[in-house]
Each structure stands twice: as C-alpha cells, then as structure tokens.
Regions:
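N-terminal membrane topogenic signal
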Residues: 34-46
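Transmembrane alpha-helices of multi-pass eukaryotic membrane proteins
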Residues: 69-73, 99, 144-149, 178
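Perimembrane helix-loop-helix junctions
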Residues: 161-162
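Transmembrane helix interruption/hinge and helix-loop junction motifs
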Residues: 64-65, 120-122, 141-146, 165-169
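Hydrophobic transmembrane alpha-helices and their membrane-interface boundaries in multi-pass
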Residues: 44-136, 154-157
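Non-catalytic regulatory/interaction regions at protein termini and inter-domain linkers
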Residues: 1-37, 129
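Juxtamembrane or sensor-core-proximal signal-transducing alpha helices
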Residues: 175-185
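Hydrophobic alpha-helical membrane segments of integral membrane proteins
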Residues: 127-129, 141, 145-154, 169-173
Length: 185
C-alpha cells in the first residue's frame, strides 16, 4: 500500500513538473501553439530590450555617475540585437532552436542583473537581479521543471558572485534575498 501511494505521488509530481499538470497527450497537442506564442513574445521582448538598452547606453553617456555602466549596456545591446537577428532568420517551425534562443535571452537578462548587482555595485544590495529573478520565469511558457532549473542555476551563480565580489556588510542581506526570491520564483 505504501509503495502504491509513493508511486502515485511520483506520477503526480512528474505530471506537474513535465506537463504542467496536463495529460502528456494534451500537452503534446498544444506545443505548436505554445511555440508560436513564445516566438511572438521573444520578438516583442527582444525589441523592447534593445530599445531599453539603447536608451540606457545613451543615458549613461550623459550622466557621469553611470559612465562605468556604458560597456555593460552596450554589450547587452549587441547581444540583444544579435539574438533578434537570429530570431528573425529562423524558420517558423524550428522549435528546438527557438527554445535555445529563449534560454539565451533569459541568460542575458540574468547575467546583466548578476553583473550589475555584484561586480558593478559591491557595496549595495542587488535589487535588479531579484526583479529579474521574479519576472523572467513569467515571460515564456515552458515546462515547469525548466523554469525551476533556470532559477536554481542563476540563483546559485548569483550566490557565488555575492560571496566573491560583495562587501561583507551586504552579503547576509543579498544571500537572504536570493534564497527568498529564488523560492518565490
């Protein structure tokens, strides 16, 4: 009896993590619609991000306090433009490459938050990363296990960077925030 309950619980967990609670057949049937929606979102988010990075780069040129951020925003702009160009060249039905491009976009956003929150501002709290940690999983439809893996990966990278680059007075608060916001995400 106990083995049966455990097996049922494992099946429910597998169904939840791999198929978002749906039946595998239903999940497979809606994948084309999910990819079309993700592609539209990726195009919109990349275009918005590029416009935002242009504004940040130009704005940083005008504010002496932000001069150090110019290369970071310029690199993010170049990466965003590159991803946008690749996305526009993809055939409509190439799902696997689209997924990799979604991961690359998420990685770029997380990396920007980690870099700005740890290396660029070692004596301040890393608020940008926590905002990205909460928002990025909501941008695209993916299997829940992939969202969880991404959050754990980048939260772990952030924690390593915090202990490596941050001022000792800020480390406890950033570690606590990373654990709380990582769990929420």
């Amino acid at each position: 009896m106990e083995e049966m309950i455990t097996r049922e619980q494992m099946e429910k967990l597998k169904k939840l993590l791999l198929y978002a609670g749906a039946e595998p057949e239903d999940f497979a049937r809606c994948q084309m619609d999910v990819q079309i929606a993700n592609r539209r979102r990726l195009t919109a988010f990349l275009g918005t991000a590029c416009a935002f990075f242009v504004a940040l780069t130009l704005g940083s040129c005008m504010v002496p306090l932000l001069y150090d951020h110019i290369p970071v925003f310029a690199v993010a702009l170049i990466v965003g433009l590159g991803l946008l160009a690749v996305e526009q060249m993809l055939p409509q039905k190439l799902g696997l490459f689209l997924n990799w491009e979604i991961y690359a976009f998420g990685a770029m956003v997380y990396a920007l938050g980690i870099y700005l929150g740890t290396v660029q501002t070692p004596d301040q709290r890393a608020t940008a990363f926590f905002a990205f940690l909460l928002c990025v999983p909501m941008l695209f439809m993916m299997r829940p296990i992939l969202h969880i893996a991404n959050v754990l990966l980048f939260d772990g990278i952030f924690l390593v960077c915090v202990t490596r680059f941050k001022d000792w007075r800020v480390i406890p608060m950033d570690v606590c925030n990373a654990l709380v916001f990582g769990a929420i995400s």
